[in-house]
């Protein structure tokens, strides 16, 4: 029986240990910030990106991996007869999945390579990657793994709190006048990604709104505490891990000590969309 290998992109929130343990192949996105372009995770770290983003007058840009890199990666992974499941960030956020599909056509390996739109990014994408890798390790078939991924997608959650609207304004989602007023009013925005679409869920003012957001997430985790194995908490910060998020992680552990919680800096694509001090909670129910 042929081996099943897992392929993903650098926006997936995975630790170096996880990548090594499951032999996951990660293709880097490109990020342009401060007039220079870097390969995400290879030529620039997440912390370095956030620092450069904070110093840049222009909104950073992220670009999908090149078709050539994807073709080379697919040819390499399938050269021994292995099958590949490629799990990529939501199409609404990047053209990466379209590039991957095009690369599969160019290689003529559509019978060996199976492409999945995670419909999210960051740790939500990462959790799909990990479950696929674990399934492959257990000897499950391609169809079994693909079915499992579809089940995960139906219950996955991404709750994103935008604290600083500067990047939202730079990106044109708020006009300069509306943005200035929103900043003056201390407006915060909650984003979600139902069915792979980026949506504004709620808007509110100041710390009370953020506290209510946090409590809603904790209430949902409490209600599903026996169905959740892992929670990702991702953030954008110049000063390391915010204490608030470490406290939040502990509250999750207090709800159910068996839930694994990963607190980690987010990828450039989320940092670009969300801006400084943003944070996201990501998980799914079984």
Task: Give the label of every model feature segment.
Residues 52-55, 81-86, 106-117, 263:
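Glycine/charged-rich beta-loop-alpha catalytic/anionic-binding loops adjacent to active sites
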Residues 5-7, 84-86, 266:
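Short glycine-aspartate micro-motif
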Residues 55-90, 98-99, 146:
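Glycine-rich phosphate- or other oxyanion-binding loops that anchor nucleotides, phosphorylated ligands
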Residues 5-64:
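N-terminal glycine-rich anion-binding loop in soluble enzyme alpha/beta folds
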Residues 93:
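Conserved catalytic-site region of short-chain dehydrogenase/reductase
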Residues 3, 11-25, 30, 96, ...:
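Mixed-charge interfacial surface used for oligomerization/domain docking
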Residues 7-8, 88-90, 117:
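Short beta-strand segments
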């Amino acid at each position: 029986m042929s081996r099943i290998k897992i392929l993903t992109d650098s926006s997936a929130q995975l630790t170096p240990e996880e990548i090594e343990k499951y032999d996951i192949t990660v293709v880097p996105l490109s990020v342009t910030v401060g007039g220079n372009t870097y390969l995400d995770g290879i030529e620039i770290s997440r912390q370095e990106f956030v620092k450069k983003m904070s110093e840049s007058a222009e909104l950073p840009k992220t670009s999908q991996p090149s078709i050539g890199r994807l073709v080379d990666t697919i040819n390499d992974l399938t050269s021994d007869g292995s099958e590949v499941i490629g799990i990529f960030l939501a199409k609404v956020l990047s053209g990466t999945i379209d590039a991957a599909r095009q690369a599969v056509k160019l290689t003529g390996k559509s019978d060996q390579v199976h492409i999945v739109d995670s419909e999210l990014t960051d740790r939500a994408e990462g959790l799909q990657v990990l479950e696929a890798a674990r399934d492959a390790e257990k000897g499950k078939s391609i169809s079994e793994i693909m079915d499992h991924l579809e089940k995960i997608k139906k219950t996955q959650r991404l709750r994103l709190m935008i604290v600083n609207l500067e990047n939202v304004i730079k990106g044109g989602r708020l006009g300069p006048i509306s943005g200035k007023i929103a900043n003056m009013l201390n407006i915060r925005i909650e984003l979600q990604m139902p069915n792979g679409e980026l949506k504004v869920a709620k808007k509110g003012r100041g710390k009370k709104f953020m506290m209510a957001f946090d409590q809603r997430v904790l209430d949902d985790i409490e209600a599903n505490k026996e169905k959740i194995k892992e929670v990702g908490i991702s953030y954008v910060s110049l000063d390391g891990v915010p204490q608030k998020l470490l406290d939040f992680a502990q509250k999750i552990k207090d709800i159910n000590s068996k839930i694994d919680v990963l607190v980690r800096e987010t990828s450039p694509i989320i940092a670009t969309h969300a801006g400084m001090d943003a944070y996201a909670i990501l998980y799914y129910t079984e």
